[in-house]
């Protein structure tokens, strides 16, 4: 699934503390949210997919929400560096 953290990334997160944990967590969540955007893009590129009104509304909300949260987390990450 796009955006999933690898076992190595999860282990690093598990072992991290303090600012290093914050950095790894935010980086991982940005990656994870990016995976949702990949899935949204793939859905809309699939012929006939996402045409139902409820699905279209849901996926559009996911797209805008994930993009907004990525921007927030990117700003948080910049503040931590």
What annotation goes with each model-predicted range?
Residues 1-81:
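All-alpha RGS (Regulator of G-protein Signaling) helical domain and cognate RGS-like helical scaffolds
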